[in-house]
């Protein structure tokens, strides 16, 4: 019985460590193109988006807060920027993003290393393929909609 208890505790601690490690790797800015058509809950739709994700969390945590900025290009006529703040958590190899408006996205089947973050974001009945690169040079844009 004692060995079984130690085994269960060990499995629990390993799982927690992995989730904390994933949350730690997410820290910072990630940017890149999303090439798909979708409608955001603010009404923006289009085919090509340059997207920036910012993840902030405390050391040792399994989540935190951040934001997503979509730079939409409509037939290259105008450039629209929409910012959405969110909270995120890591559990069971899924990154769950809960946006301020209540919408929920789930990132699955992802690969995350020091420079690349790619996978699928399931959001509003769509699966959006993304590939982002670590972007330590990104600076916040004070003129983004939603950044009041």
Spans of features found by a protein language model:
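Bacterial N-terminal signal peptides that target proteins for export
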Residues: 1-3
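Beta-turn initiation residues at beta-strand->coil junctions
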Residues: 34-36, 68-73, 98-101, 120-124
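N-terminal helix-cap/turn-to-beta initiation motif at the start of protein domains
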Residues: 16-33
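N-terminal glycine/threonine-rich, aromatic-flanked beta-hairpin/loop signature
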Residues: 43-94
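C-terminal motif of bacterial Sec signal peptides marking the signal peptidase cleavage site
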Residues: 11-15
């Amino acid at each position: 019985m004692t060995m079984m208890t130690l085994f269960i505790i060990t499995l629990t601690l390993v799982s927690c460590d992995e989730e904390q490690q994933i949350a730690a790797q997410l820290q910072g800015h990630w940017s890149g193109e999303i090439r798909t058509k979708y409608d955001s809950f603010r009404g923006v739709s289009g085919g090509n988006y340059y997207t920036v994700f910012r993840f902030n969390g405390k050391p040792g945590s399994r989540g935190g807060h951040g934001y997503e900025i979509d730079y939409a290009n409509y037939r290259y006529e105008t450039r629209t920027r929409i910012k959405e703040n969110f909270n995120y958590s890591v559990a069971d190899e899924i990154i769950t993003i809960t946006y301020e408006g209540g919408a929920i996205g789930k990132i699955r089947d992802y690969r995350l290393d020091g420079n690349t973050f790619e996978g699928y974001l399931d959001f509003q009945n769509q699966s959006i393929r993304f590939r982002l690169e670590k972007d330590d040079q990104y600076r916040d844009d004070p003129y983004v909609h939603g950044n009041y």
